[in-house]
Amino acid sequence: EAGIGEDVRRIGSSSASNAPVPKIAGDAAKGVFFTAAYAAADNRPIAKLFNEMTRQRYGIHAPDHDFSQAYDLVRIMEIALKNADLDLSDGALAADRTAIRDAIANVEGYEGLASGPISFCAAPTPQCRDGNRTAVLIGYTKGGENFETEVLARVTMEPDFGLE
């Protein structure tokens, strides 16, 4: 108890999605909201499957955004490696690296766990580099060991948002 009334909004960063936060905060976590690329409260079928897989495999209550981003990274690399024309010989290391980079740049519309489709491109512009611009606003509805969250909003910004 820090003496902060329940009527005061409490905002956290994406790290607030990590399990120790609601476990340590207990009932004080209720009403805290934050943004992250993934919410375990997401109702999409892929999210429900991911949540169940991580519960079974790792014995955790709910996966956080770090779990989801690692999963998406591995899946995107899998797509790129399948599509890259690789030699895999000792003398082809530089060419293979370029082929992998180019294959990643050609991934478009990957529908993973992130809050929106992920696309890459070869252009070195902020619009291309910064990729998905969908933020998810998440709130704790229950704290403690068996914490619960809800998705409060999703906001997708235009590729040029904040660049003017």
Where are these regions (language model features)?
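Extracytoplasmic/secreted envelope proteins and their assembly/folding machinery
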Residues: 18, 47-51, 74, 78, ...
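Short, surface-exposed amphipathic charged segments that create phosphate/polyanion-binding patches used
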Residues: 26-27, 48-52, 134
